[in-house]
Swiss-Prot record:
Gene3D superfamilies: 2.30.30.30. Part of the 50S ribosomal subunit. GO terms for biological process: translation. One of its GO terms (molecular function) is rRNA binding. This is Large ribosomal subunit protein uL24. It holds the Pfam family ribosomal_L24. One of two assembly initiator proteins, it binds directly to the 5'-end of the 23S rRNA, where it nucleates assembly of the 50S subunit. One of the proteins that surrounds the polypeptide exit tunnel on the outside of the subunit. SUPFAM superfamilies: Translation proteins SH3-like domain. Keywords: Ribonucleoprotein, Ribosomal protein, RNA-binding, rRNA-binding.
Amino acid sequence: MNKIRKGDEVVVLAGKDRGRRGVVLSRVDDERLLVEGVNRVKKHVRPNPLKGEVGGIVEKEMPLHISNVALFNPAAQKGDRVGIRVLEDGRKVRFFKSNGELVDA
């Protein structure tokens, strides 16, 4: 079970966008994820007439390592560590380690 998933709101812990919040758009692989509005770079794109692409400078999000983000805890209003707990009915749920609240209600 992944501790951070697509659609979660996260806080950036390290790097040029430290402290910014964003929503996880996708997981690139097991260790990296795309966060909306965070780690934006300008990419120079060459025109390709065969595909109908015009050239120019495109601004896009680049992946962040999962260790550089923390799940946003709305009760504490900050990034928080996440644990996994097994309930009585056998379901695995995520919870915030600071206050024990369930992430997946």
